[in-house]
Amino acid sequence: DDAAVDQAIRDNDLVSKFTCLDNPSADQVASWLDEGLVVARFSKRMEFGQRALGNRSILADPRRWESVERINSKIKYRDFWMPFTPSMMKEEADRLIENPKGLYSPFMTLAFDLKQEFRLAIPAAQHPSDKTVRPQMLKREDNPGYYDIIAAFRERTGLGVVLNTSFNLHGEPIVESPEDAISTFLRSDIDVLLFDHVAISRSNPSS
């Protein structure tokens, strides 16, 4: 909860070391992604499994191939060929991917071909060899806070999709507690650590 987050922030003296922004809006988060910043989102209950679905996720701009290079080399410390996956608004799916059967894929379990016209648009969130994506299709009622970030990103960029990878370092489990999130933030090159009611930034984030 927020109290546990606040305590972890105090315990790690983050206020004196970084910029803290209270109650960041979805549009502010979208603006950081649009600027090329890498944002780690920690929200509510833990997630576990093979995929992160927005509440323990590292987010980046899918339009920038440098997002892949930076996350691999300075955050996830993993092999260059391992692809990242996108989270997209459900209503964007038909526009972005080939899905003739209208399949709904909320858990990143199905692979789809990107439509030809979008292969150059989101290079960071597709398989570099076969140009497929394994998307999380997101309805607002499933995760309003996360959905609103993606919707705000669409307002800015015309694309209702973000790069989403699990919030952890390579070889470690997905972060569970605020302390885990802060530890991973401090040991990596993540730009912004986003909790529900506060954001911790390595620099002075624009609004």
Question: Where does each model-flagged region fall?
Answer:
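Flexible beta->alpha loop and helix N-cap segments adjacent to enzyme active/binding sites
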Residues: 1-207
